[in-house]
Amino acid sequence: MFKGAIVAIVTPFKNGEIDEPALRDLIEFQIENGTDGIVPCGTTGESATLSHEEHDRVIEITIDAVRKRVPVIAGTGSNSTVEAMRLTKHAHEAGADGVLVVAPYYNRPTQEGLYQHYKALAESVPIPIIPYNIPSRTGVNILPETVARLAKISNIVGIKEASGSLKQMNDVIRLCDDGFSVLSGDDFFTLPLLTLGGKGVISVISNVAPADMACLVDAFEAGNMKKARAMHDKMVPLVDALFIETNPTPVKAALALMGKISEDVRLPLYRMTETSREKLKRVMQNYGLIG
């Protein structure tokens, strides 16, 4: 079962190319600070602007750098089922422990189309699959009843839920067996989802504060709700600041302020405004991440 504090890791760039040394350093930073798993090539990893070759390479680098210390769940989604199959097959052959597959975007399939998309993937590659529901980006919502159907497929093992609806998340948990991992796709909903029976989070804030998100999840699992609530409250201002502009622009700016990477993003994403940067910087100073 995939659970705990899992990071949706950024893809660092330098002079327009993947910065492999920086990516390897980020992975060490994550593992040293208690992260339970790493997701390369997700939304936060700018998968949409990676070439096919770069996408494959980022996954390979991550698997090599992690060295089986924590699970690697590779982002392999596409709005083409055939392309998602290719990406998923590569991740499996490269040694990924699982794949995160965003719902097909732009073409807006029906619920039956979504079911058949994931079913075809599951039948084509023998790897644990986590569908990713984020209607605000994809234009389609994987409904709880569809998730319940998917959960009956043996290698569809969980879902990253970013619908923004706790009611929907609760319905998914209610309709699926306890072994099905419902993971928050929104840092703010991590603690509320855990209280409903969720298993963890695929996190953006973990890029900059991995120990704190790991602490929240560990405290909850240990039954220390007071500590879990304190960590939640501590992180809320930073979560807000990391979404002051389109993800992953702010989190890359934050990592740059911490001296870990260049803040380069690829067009059509663009660097932060100075107003947003100053707001982010103040929050990070108050949080203790920078001086």
From Swiss-Prot:
Q: Which GO terms describe its molecular function?
A: 4-hydroxy-tetrahydrodipicolinate synthase activity
Q: Which CDD domains match?
A: DHDPS
Give the GO terms filed under biological process for this record. diaminopimelate biosynthetic process; lysine biosynthetic process via diaminopimelate
Q: Which reaction does it catalyse?
A: L-aspartate 4-semialdehyde + pyruvate = (2S,4S)-4-hydroxy-2,3,4,5-tetrahydrodipicolinate + H2O + H(+)
Q: Which organism is this protein's natural source? A: Syntrophus aciditrophicus (strain SB)
- Catalytic machinery residues: Y132, K160
Q: Which UniProt keywords apply?
A: Amino-acid biosynthesis, Cytoplasm, Diaminopimelate biosynthesis, Lyase, Lysine biosynthesis, Schiff base
Cited InterPro entries: Aldolase_TIM (IPR013785), DapA (IPR005263), DapA-like (IPR002220), Schiff_base-form_aldolases_AS (IPR020625), Schiff_base-form_aldolases_CS (IPR020624)
Where, by residue number, does pyruvate bind? T44, I202
Q: What class of enzyme is it?
A: lyase
Q: Where is this site: Part of a proton relay during catalysis?
A: T43, Y106
GO CC entries: cytosol
Major location category of this protein:
cytoplasm
Family statement drawn from the similarity comment of this UniProt entry:
Belongs to the DapA family.
Query: Where does this protein act, in terms of pathway?
Result: Amino-acid biosynthesis; L-lysine biosynthesis via DAP pathway; (S)-tetrahydrodipicolinate from L-aspartate: step 3/4
Q: Which PANTHER family match?
A: 4-HYDROXY-2-OXOGLUTARATE ALDOLASE, MITOCHONDRIAL, DIHYDRODIPICOLINATE SYNTHASE
EC assignment: 4.3.3.7
Under what name is this protein listed? 4-hydroxy-tetrahydrodipicolinate synthase
Question: Where is this chain's protein located in or outside the cell?
Answer: Cytoplasm
Q: Which Gene3D superfamilies match?
A: Aldolase class I (3.20.20.70)
What role is this protein assigned? Answer: Catalyzes the condensation of (S)-aspartate-beta-semialdehyde [(S)-ASA] and pyruvate to 4-hydroxy-tetrahydrodipicolinate (HTPA).
What is its quaternary makeup? Homotetramer; dimer of dimers.
